[in-house]
């Protein structure tokens, strides 16, 4: 990553740099580390890396090149979200053979569909879930398709003792 601008201009600088330099209105959250997801996003049989970032810094999609170097394709792939992102999943949510992107942010859960060539389109923005952490995917109900489980920490209930219920999408 040494010759990659994402490394030298963002990752190498560390959290203290961003804590001092990001506008407070972005509410950068530096509690713990942010997530990472690894999968082949463009069908070249090389694993790529998605790095979640605190608010105000673009999330990064780093594409592995055949020569072992890495290129930042975040903007081209349309996944350079500036939202405070806590976790990511790269998993085939629509059963078309490629890896889609699911992101837990402090304000919403985002699901972006992959076109098979590493370009993503936002398909769902679930704002009513609040801030999510640690999403996982499995066929929980055994119906043949993947389901998402999104965990939340210290979230409010609806004041009647009920907690969030499933949200189909």
Predicted features along the sequence, with ranges:
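A short loop-to-beta-strand structural motif that recurs across blades of beta-propeller domains
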Residues: 60-62, 108-110
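Hydrophobic beta-strand segments that make up the repeating blades of beta-propeller
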Residues: 48-53, 99-105, 148-152
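Beta-propeller fold detector
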Residues: 1-2, 71-76, 121-125
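Short, conserved, GDST-rich strand-edge loop motifs in beta-rich repeat architectures
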Residues: 152-169
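Short loop/turn segments that connect beta-strands within beta-propeller blades
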Residues: 65-68, 114-118
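Short, solvent-exposed loop/turn segments at conserved positions within beta-propeller repeat blades
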Residues: 54-57, 107, 168-169
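Beta-propeller blade termini
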Residues: 33-43, 63, 84-95, 113, ...
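Repeat-based blade/solenoid architectures
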Residues: 5-35, 77-89, 125-136
